[in-house]
């Protein structure tokens, strides 16, 4: 990116947050480049080092809806209505995650990340894989 304008943004990391944020920025007219130190997980089998699933509540769904991928993720999400607690006496307590009929949803972190990166690219975001940030020139950063 040789020419700098006030509309160019660089994001370090194409994880869940970086990819989602890039979609919102691109839709607001910014030229967005993401630099990701890992290879493209959509093309290679990468061990992410994170939990396999993550739980999405209402706030997470709103973020995905704004990015236009809510319906795609709902197809693979599994509702979790509550948790069961087993105490030392062997007693069981059930705790709902919300009011009757409400749930949080388990979904694959990897699938969600792949969908977010693909949607980011559809919105013009350029993702540079296998690129590690080794420093920042603070004088040229706005």
Where are these regions (language model features)?
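Conserved N-terminal helical subregion
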Residues: 2-6, 57-142
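N-terminal Rossmann-like FAD-binding beta1-loop-alpha1 element of flavoenzymes
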Residues: 4-34
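A generic secondary-structure micro-motif detector
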Residues: 11, 50, 105-106
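Short amphipathic alpha-helical segments, especially helix-boundary/capping motifs
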Residues: 17, 34-41, 88-95
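Short glycine-/acidic-enriched loop or helix-start segments at secondary-structure transitions
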Residues: 21, 44, 138
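Glycine-rich FAD pyrophosphate-binding loop
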Residues: 26-49
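A conserved FAD-binding loop/helix module that cradles the flavin
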Residues: 53
């Amino acid at each position: 990116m040789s020419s700098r304008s006030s509309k160019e943004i660089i994001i370090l990391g194409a994880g869940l947050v970086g990819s989602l944020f890039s979609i919102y920025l691109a839709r607001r007219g910014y030229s967005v480049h993401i630099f990701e130190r890992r290879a493209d997980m959509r093309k290679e089998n990468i061990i992410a080092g994170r939990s396999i699933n993550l739980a999405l509540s209402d706030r997470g769904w709103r973020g995905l809806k704004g990015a236009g991928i809510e319906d795609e993720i709902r197809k693979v999400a599994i509702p979790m209505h509550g948790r069961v607690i087993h105490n030392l006496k062997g007693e069981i307590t059930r705790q709902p995650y919300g009011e009757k009929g409400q749930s949080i949803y388990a979904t694959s972190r990897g699938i969600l990340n792949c969908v977010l990166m693909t949607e980011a690219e559809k919105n013009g975001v350029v993702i540079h894989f296998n690129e590690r940030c080794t420093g920042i020139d603070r004088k040229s950063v706005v």
